Regions:
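Helix-turn-helix DNA-binding module
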Residues: 99, 103, 107, 115-132, ...
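Arg/Lys-rich amphipathic alpha helix in sigma70-family domain 2
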Residues: 37-44, 54-74, 87
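Residues within the DNA-recognition helix of helix-turn-helix
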Residues: 8, 136-139, 143
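Short, small-hydrophobic-rich alpha-helical interface motif
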Residues: 12, 16, 24-35, 122, ...
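A short, charge-rich alpha-helical start-of-domain segment used by transcription regulators
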Residues: 1-14, 21, 36
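C-terminal edge and immediately downstream basic/flexible tail or linker adjoining helix-turn-helix-like DNA-binding
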Residues: 78, 93, 124-125, 142-150
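Short helix-capping/turn signature of helix-turn-helix
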Residues: 7-10, 18-19, 110-118
Length: 150
């Protein structure tokens, strides 16, 4: 079990952090509780990552909805790393902009623009129609662009 959690933790942490923001750790913990409780119900081991992604997104949205968002504390971002070197001020600006969006908008941006899921894949994961994903993505991108002040 420890190896499984270690393997999944970076991805789950990234998804939960992007959607639940400062409550990302809570969402990650809830995700792993749900995964460990329900692992026996997973019929197809090859589907593990998709199954965990679905749980992580849903838990992150639930946690984000359940609590008031606190302003992003820049000191919580110090340990962040990325593939491409980026300015910490930009990271803070992006997180602050994301904090102004609804959890569902953050989720669709993460799934489509960060994870690169297709409309159909995102729709299946979120349990909505592909057209709904398309309209939500448009609204989320528009809302992000309106709030973005680099």
């Amino acid at each position: 079990m420890d190896a499984l959690v270690r393997e999944l933790m970076p991805y789950v942490g990234r998804v939960c952090g992007a959607i639940a923001l400062d409550r990302g750790d809570d969402a990650m913990q809830e995700t792993f509780i749900s995964v460990l409780r329900n692992l026996r119900t997973l019929r197809e081991p090859a589907a593990l990552h998709g199954w965990v992604r679905r749980i992580a997104v849903r838990e992150a949205i639930r946690v984000a909805r359940s609590g008031r968002e606190d302003p992003t504390d820049p000191t919580t971002l110090v340990g962040l790393t990325s593939v491409a070197p980026i300015d910490m001020a930009t990271v803070i600006d992006v997180r602050t902009t994301l904090a102004g969006l609804a959890p569902e908008q953050r989720a669709i941006l993460v799934l489509r623009d960060v994870d690169g899921l297709s409309e159909a894949e995102a729709a299946q994961l979120l349990g909505v129609a592909a057209g709904t994903v398309k309209s939500r993505l448009h609204r989320a991108r528009s809302a992000f662009a309106r709030r973005w002040e680099p």
